[in-house]
């Protein structure tokens, strides 16, 4: 089907905006769709776009206003409330979460508005905790890279947009105070409820989150959803996420189509209206996802590897006619590889990936086999000046040079140059932001090292359950330090008990029953240890924590934790 046209051969489509930010022309055009605007969807329904990564939606019921999604911070939601007050003075009485991504501004409502109910999926709290504990460093690093959080505001590397919004967090919402308030009414399956005097039909519709729902308001003929975005749906998130099965997504899209809505209001992008227009556009959106899944299975059955899928499967030109299915967020070539991995795992049948060398070893050997570093550098410079697949070749060469143990600053700069070339020529905001963040890290403009270790914030730790605050140690174990160690430790903080069993080079979470030793003290002291403002030895020596049992064995076990609070 030819080139997907999402990574240009040259700079002919690259333009600079008024702030000097270099990007594909279509990505600049996409920014206009995400511009701040309080849309009046219909009488009594408003959607605020451009206030943050997500929209905030408001519906007027007989008993007051319903707010759907509260953004990423208290400041963001206060801004949304200010916009609401320009169109109505009616009180906000209900809150609904479409999924766990945009729930952090609710405190802005509960502190002043007469909220009677907060509705959300039962899994929201669990999903929030998962992202903030064991996988927190990788998750946070992925957010920084995908959403360009450390990119400058202007200049060639400046942030243009993040595909679904103008930015992950708007600068004028600093310091972006978290204000999550848990739902006091939850659902796990399809249900119809009355909120603010309005009938609201809730239907689970997993998309980029397994707790995502579609909300149908028959009175307004409006569906609020997390399915049809202002760009091709992101089966694969470059930041790293759990597998999003397109077959499940298709069920949600088919349900959305079946509503025959007059208005669709998404979590991202401008609202859409008109039954006939919606039927055509949502059907095409749905079919783009089926196309990717069907063709991935077709070519996988024929033996194609991941990279082969990326080049053989191209979205037909029809999908480039509507911005709903254009590749301004993720890329189809990544989505098909993710679908294959989701179905069959990481190994795609290529012997190269069966028993691979360590990255640095492979780079060293390949550079040597190609004639040495200087020759590879020349090849890389030539490729950067070329067209067609030369840009991909340049990235491959530069990465091998930079991965070598003896990599020089010149090698790092070459890789940064290759990444910047890809960044300005891609239509994908995700790829642009990722490439530029890595380039800035390589050339020393920013420092990402702090995001490659477990770093816990005070407010973050305070929100965890006791079980989460102790079981997180399992992913901090330096296994060699547990050689010969077998100790079951109970941890009792503020009278609440949990436990962890150090054995066989792991730390296994337990309930702390029948433990050989007990660590006791205030939860606040444990939080200080996790955040690095104290350490376990000093806490015990000062009497803030006490140990019942063999103190030496407890310290030996805890010393296996790769964290300054325990070493």
Located regions from the model:
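Divalent metal-coordination and catalytic microenvironments
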Residues: 44, 59, 69, 84, ...
């Amino acid at each position: 089907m030819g080139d997907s046209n999402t990574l240009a051969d040259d700079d002919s489509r690259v333009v600079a905006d008024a702030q000097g930010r270099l990007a594909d022309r279509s990505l600049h055009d996409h920014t206009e769709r995400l511009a701040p605007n309080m849309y009046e969807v219909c009488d009594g329904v408003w959607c605020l776009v451009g206030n943050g990564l997500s929209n905030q939606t408001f519906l007027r019921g007989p008993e007051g206003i319903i707010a759907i999604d509260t953004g990423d911070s208290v400041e963001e939601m206060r801004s949304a409330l200010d916009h609401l007050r320009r169109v109505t003075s009616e009180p906000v009485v209900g809150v609904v979460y479409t999924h766990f991504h945009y729930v952090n501004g609710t405190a802005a409502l509960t502190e002043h508005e007469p909220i009677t109910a907060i509705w959300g999926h039962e899994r929201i709290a669990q999903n929030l905790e998962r992202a903030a504990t064991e996988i927190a460093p990788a998750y946070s690093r992925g957010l920084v890279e995908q959403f360009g959080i450390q990119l400058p505001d202007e200049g060639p590397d400046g942030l243009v947009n993040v595909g679904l919004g103008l930015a992950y967090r708007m600068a004028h919402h600093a310091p972006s105070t978290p204000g999550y308030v848990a739902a006091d009414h939850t659902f796990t399956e399809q249900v119809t409820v009355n909120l603010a005097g309005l009938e609201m039909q809730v239907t689970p519709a997993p998309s980029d989150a397994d707790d995502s729902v579609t909300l149908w308001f028959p009175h307004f003929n409006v569906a609020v959803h997390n399915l049809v975005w202002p760009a091709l749906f992101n089966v694969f998130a470059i930041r790293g996420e759990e597998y999003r099965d397109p077959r499940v997504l298709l069920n949600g899209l088919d349900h959305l189509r079946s509503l025959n809505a007059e208005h669709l209001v998404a979590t991202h992008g401008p609202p859409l209206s008109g039954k006939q227009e919606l039927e055509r556009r949502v059907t095409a959106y749905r079919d783009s996802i089926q196309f990717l899944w069907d063709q991935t299975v077709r070519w996988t059955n024929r033996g194609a590897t991941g990279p082969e899928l990326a080049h053989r499967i191209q979205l037909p030109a029809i999908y480039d006619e509507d911005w709903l299915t254009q590749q301004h967020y993720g890329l189809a070539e990544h989505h098909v590889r993710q679908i294959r991995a989701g179905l069959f795992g990481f190994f795609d049948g290529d012997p190269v990936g069966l028993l691979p060398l360590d990255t640095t070893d492979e780079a060293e050997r390949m550079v040597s086999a190609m004639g040495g570093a200087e020759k590879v550098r020349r090849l890389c410079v030539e490729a950067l000046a070329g067209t067609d697949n030369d840009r991909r070749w340049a990235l491959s060469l530069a990465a091998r040079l930079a991965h070598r143990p003896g990599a020089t600053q010149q090698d790092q700069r070459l890789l940064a140059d290759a990444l910047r070339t890809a960044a300005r020529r891609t239509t994908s905001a995700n790829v642009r932001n990722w490439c530029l963040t890595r380039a800035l890290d390589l050339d020393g403009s920013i420092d990402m090292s702090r995001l490659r270790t477990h770093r816990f914030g005070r407010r973050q730790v305070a929100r965890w359950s006791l079980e989460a605050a102790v079981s997180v140690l399992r992913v901090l174990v330096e296994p060699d330090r547990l050689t010969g160690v077998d100790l079951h430790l109970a941890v009792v903080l503020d009278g609440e008990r949990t436990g962890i069993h150090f054995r066989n080079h792991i730390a296994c979470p337990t309930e702390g029953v029948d433990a050989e030793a007990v660590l006791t003290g205030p939860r606040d002291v444990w939080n200080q240890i996790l955040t690095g403002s104290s350490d376990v030895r000093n806490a015990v020596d000062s009497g803030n924590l006490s140990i019942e049992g063999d103190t030496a064995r407890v310290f030996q076990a805890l010393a296996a934790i790769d964290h300054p609070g325990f070493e």
